[in-house]
């Protein structure tokens, strides 16, 4: 249970996404409020990461989720980048009139997917984080429905991402066939020992 403290940033962002959706449903004209709450949520998640300094490398969920110095640094960089995007895009979304409750929520979902990818130590967890990030970015790429270029970008991104996801899954299946595992550490050990799962 103590180790679960290390994933409080991810848990908090997940709860923030659900809370912001509820606020958007029950409170009309709440786009600006949700936008500001999103920035506050990212700041709180950043504070949670700093509140739990990493002394050693830790693994969670049967070694499928890893917390270390590198993953912590990359999460901090991701959250800071998310805050920067929110601050710099505030005027743009108002000028183009695309400031809706979905915009900050999708951005939070994408950031959550990135954080899952960063700490993933398993092919399945990595793929889940990748899809969570990608699905949000599909919509964000085509968010300005009145702009044909935005719609075109969203469609192209979706098609290319669907193709790349299929190739990734195929590659993951080959790796699993060679190593008999989806865990990164076990995959490396099996490959280093020249044990490719061949009979």
Model-derived features: where do they sit?
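Alpha-helical transmembrane segments of multi-pass membrane proteins predominantly involved
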Residues: 1-199
